[in-house]
């Protein structure tokens, strides 16, 4: 049992955390037919491309800043109830623009949900702005420029997500230069759908402190040595990897092998209801499927806090809470 352990999550896409029950309620509010992507309380998709389409359909039921405040508060409250003390939410200003809300109002809604959740539960949260790779380099660069320009106190990181097979990392490197120059923490999705070469490209061209997923690095011993040497943290999401058939089962998943090799790893839920999981389940899997003991799981939580995109005073406060638990 891991319910008693304090938890931290640094890889979760906000719209991907939308509970099906909330999506149904939102769809009724706006008269949206959900039958194409939500049936019997579960999201419907069969491969990565369909997952992206389903994700986008779910996101369409959130149309106002108030909607985003409700979504954010709902998810963070769920995390807090599972003993989570820190969360980073990945959001896309592109989505705010596409639905006609605008990036500023979209961000304001998320920030309000964070405020309410912290007031209710004490959970600490930061925001990672992401560019969507499948929209092309110009849109990813625009997302980085927005994150750099907005100077929002809760926006502390920049990411690139989306279809990993779209374009070369080099095509998007300028976006990360912009974010780095603005003082934002850097993370990038790599080594999930694509192999270890995508992780190597990320290290060479982006030089992030963290990599989203990165599990395919296990296929290259030299790359593993490099990750150990650089101390780059892998944001590992086992339930997501199984659901998307990156690995056939947990016995095949390399989380334990990565940890045993000395790679810094932590665990997150990615898009939890899409992958029939939750952060609480990911922590339980760490024990039940991978054989980590409480001390080893706490070490992964400590890693998440050590590499979190927060100011040092907040980091020390969070680490002290973990140390006192």
UniProtKB/Swiss-Prot annotation:
Q: Does the keyword Metal-binding apply?
A: yes
Concerning CDD domains, the annotation shows: ADA (cd01320)
Does this UniProt record's set of keywords contain Nucleotide-binding? Answer: no
Pfam families, alphabetically? A_deaminase (PF00962)
Q: InterPro entries recorded for this chain? A: A_deaminase_dom (IPR001365), ADE (IPR028892), Ado/ade_deaminase (IPR006330), Metal_Hydrolase (IPR032466)
Q: Please provide, alphabetically and separated by semicolons, the GO molecular function terms listed in this UniProt record.
A: adenine deaminase activity; zinc ion binding
According to its UniProt record, the EC number is 3.5.4.2
Write out the entry's keywords from A to Z: Hydrolase, Metal-binding, Nucleotide metabolism, Zinc
Per the entry, the cofactor note is:
Binds 1 zinc ion per subunit.
What does it catalyze? adenine + H2O + H(+) = hypoxanthine + NH4(+)
GO biological process, alphabetically ordered: adenine catabolic process; hypoxanthine salvage; nucleotide metabolic process
Q: Which domain of life is it from?
A: Bacteria
Ligand binding (Zn(2+)) = 11, 13, 189, 270
Cofactors that this protein relies on: Zn(2+)
Q: Where is the site described as Important for catalytic activity found in this chain?
A: 213
User: What positions does the entry give for substrate binding?
Assistant: 271
Spell out the catalytic residues: 192
The role this protein plays is:
Catalyzes the hydrolytic deamination of adenine to hypoxanthine. Plays an important role in the purine salvage pathway and in nitrogen catabolism.
Which family does the UniProt entry place this protein in? Answer: Belongs to the metallo-dependent hydrolases superfamily. Adenosine and AMP deaminases family. Adenine deaminase type 2 subfamily.
* Name of protein: Adenine deaminase
